[in-house]
Design a protein with these regions (language model features):
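Residues at the starts of beta-strands that form the adenosine-phosphate
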Residues: 6, 39-40, 198-199
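A short, glycine/small-residue-rich beta-strand->loop->alpha-helix junction that serves as a flexible
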Residues: 12-26, 54
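Conserved nucleotide-sugar donor-interacting segment of glycosyltransferase catalytic cores
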Residues: 151-201
Length: 201
């Protein structure tokens, strides 16, 4: 990776450590060699709940900068996200989380992008499923009754649209799928005709 590289981590552990991926992320974001070559890091995942206050959305070490689900709509971010939210019928939470290695003192604050996909418009979702079938042979009708599958398919298109709105649509951006949950977003990154993302699984 060269300087100026943005690394997007698509994961179900964007906000809290649940299992192994959380430990991996903690290691990345407090590792000097990673921080030296990754100019920008963004965590992407679904918003699992709208319960609680806006201050709790990104966990105890998080700072929420924008949250349409809570009515926190600063103009700079609203311009970037409003069209995406209307088109896909999703909510967006955006901010930062701080990761610290208590032994070394190394810390960093990657961006966090969460998307509430519970009420997604069916049109764009079905179009994405069609494109996944045509290009990759993925038969979503076999799995879409499983929310564990469906929510991550719904995440893909608005996540890539939001990343583009945040200024990351070029070859210096790497979309990393952590486990199967990130695959639909990585596939949308490949399918998007106006982007030049690189992808890793």
């Amino acid at each position: 990776m060269a300087m100026g590289t943005t690394v997007v981590h698509v994961t179900h552990e964007a906000v809290g450590k649940i299992g192994g991926i959380g430990a991996v992320l903690q290691g990345f974001f407090t590792c000097p060699s990673y921080l030296k070559i990754a100019d920008r890091s963004i965590l992407v995942g679904p918003l699992f709940t709208t319960e609680g206050s806006v201050q709790e959305r990104l966990g105890p070490d998080g700072e929420v900068l924008y949250s349409s689900v809570d009515g926190l709509l600063p103009s700079g971010y609203r311009v970037a996200f409003e069209r995406i939210e209307r088109y896909y019928n999703v909510g967006i939470v955006y901010g930062r989380r701080t990761f610290t290695d208590t032994e070394t003192g190394v810390s960093s604050s990657p961006e966090v992008l969460l998307i509430d996909v519970r009420h997604s418009d069916r049109g764009p979702v079905n179009d994405f499923k069609r494109r996944m079938y045509e290009e990759f042979g993925i038969q979503s009708q076999r799995y879409e009754h499983l929310w564990e599958y469906e929510q991550y398919v719904r995440l893909g298109p608005p996540a890539i649209a939001a990343l583009k709105a945040l200024g990351t649509p070029n070859e210096s951006t790497i979309v990393v799928s952590h486990e199967f949950m990130g695959m639909p977003t990585a596939l949308e990154a490949i399918l998007d005709p106006n982007s030049d993302f690189r992808t890793v699984f």
